[in-house]
Every structure is written in structure tokens, then in C-alpha cells.
């Protein structure tokens, strides 16, 4: 069993999404008796934006397909995912490999893979929030993974930019959710 651990935050040790993905990976590894972990830090070693020349490099796709579980840290920057994460997604959403077009429309080809995504946001963007219309990270990630045949699981830490107290409260709550997800 292999875990692919994806981090996209540029905030290093101060990153809430990195703290959450580390906790998820640690708990899954412990529960599964030390699964192999492949860590791809998209902020430290970003993939170039997709070009025709870059399309031939299938290393990100190969890692994704080989993993049994994928854990993704997705901080929300300017209402969506970081460009580093988008560049990675561009390499795993491949016609004929992770999805196909058929008579009934697109069909996801990725089966039996668990994807856990930790989304961190500076404000509150839930459905009941006045800012809900500005949230494009969760909706994008859910749509992309559904498109390729995966039902992703999410944990959220919201309101991180409001105050230090709110940040601490949100992270504590998210870590409780992580324990439930990783079980």
C-alpha cells in the first residue's frame, strides 16, 4: 500500500494545510502498519505549467496511479487552489488514462483510490456564509476528482486569517476531523 502525500502551501512550517496533511499521513501510516509514503512538495519543487513539451513527463501521473491513498493539502489562495496544485492536476487528468469520453459523456477511469483533501481558508466560505459565492477550491477539487472517478473526502479549516484564536480553534476542530477520516 502506498500513500502519495501532496503539499501545495508556500507557507512552510507555518502552513495549516501542511500540518493537516502530515497528521492524516501519520495516522493512516500508523493504522496501516507503516505504508510507503511518497511526498511531493509542489511549493518547494513546482511542476512547470503544462506545455506540449511538458506533457511527455508522466512522473506525476505515474505516482498518482500507483498510490492507493492520496493526501492533498489545498490552501485556498484568491478563492481557488494554488497554481502549483493546478499544474499537478493538469498532469493527472488525462483523456484515455484517468477519464474517457463515451456515448454517454465522460467516464472516470480511476477506481478504488482513496483521496483525502485538507482545505484551509482564511475566511468562512461554507454554504451558509455570505462569502460562499467566492469559494472555488472545494467545488473545483470535488468536480475534478469526481470527473476522473474518485469521490474525495474533505477536511476543512476555516477562518484561519481572522484571529490567532480562531486559527487555533479551526485547526483543533480540523485535527479532530482528521482522526475520523484517517480511521
Question: What are these language model-derived features?
Answer:
Residues 42, 120, 157-159:
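Active-site donor-binding loop signature of nucleotide-sugar glycosyltransferases
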Residues 9-11, 122-125, 159-163:
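A short, flexible beta-alpha/helix-coil linker loop
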Residues 55-66, 107, 133, 143, ...:
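Functional cleft and adjacent loop/helix regions within the main domain
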Residues 101-147:
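Short, glycine-/small-residue-rich phosphate/pyrophosphate-handling segment
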Residues 95-99, 150-152:
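Short, structured loop/turn "capping" segments at alpha-beta junctions
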Residues 5, 72, 115-119, 154:
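Structural beta-sheet core signal
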Amino acid at each position: 500500500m502506498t500513500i502519495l502525500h501532496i503539499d501545495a502551501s508556500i507557507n512552510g512550517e507555518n502552513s495549516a494545510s501542511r500540518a493537516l496533511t502530515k497528521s492524516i499521513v501519520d495516522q493512516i501510516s500508523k493504522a496501516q502498519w507503516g505504508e510507503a509514503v511518497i511526498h511531493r512538495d509542489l511549493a518547494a519543487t513546482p511542476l512547470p505549467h503544462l506545455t506540449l513539451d511538458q506533457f511527455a513527463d508522466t512522473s506525476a501521473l505515474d505516482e498518482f496511479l500507483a498510490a492507493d491513498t492520496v493526501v492533498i493539502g489545498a490552501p485556498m489562495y484568491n478563492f481557488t487552489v494554488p497554481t502549483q496544485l493546478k499544474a499537478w492536476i493538469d498532469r493527472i487528468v488525462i483523456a484515455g488514462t484517468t477519464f474517457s469520453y463515451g456515448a454517454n459523456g465522460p467516464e472516470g477511469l480511476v477506481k478504488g483510490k482513496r483521496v483525502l483533501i485538507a482545505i484551509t481558508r482564511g475566511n468562512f466560505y461554507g454554504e451558509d456564509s455570505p462569502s460562499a459565492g467566492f469559494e472555488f477550491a472545494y467545488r473545483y477539487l470535488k468536480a475534478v476528482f469526481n470527473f476522473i472517478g474518485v469521490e474525495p473526502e474533505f477536511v476543512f479549516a476555516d477562518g484561519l486569517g481572522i484571529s490567532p484564536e480562531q486559527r487555533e480553534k479551526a485547526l483543533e476542530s480540523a485535527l479532530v476531523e482528521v482522526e475520523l477520516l484517517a480511521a
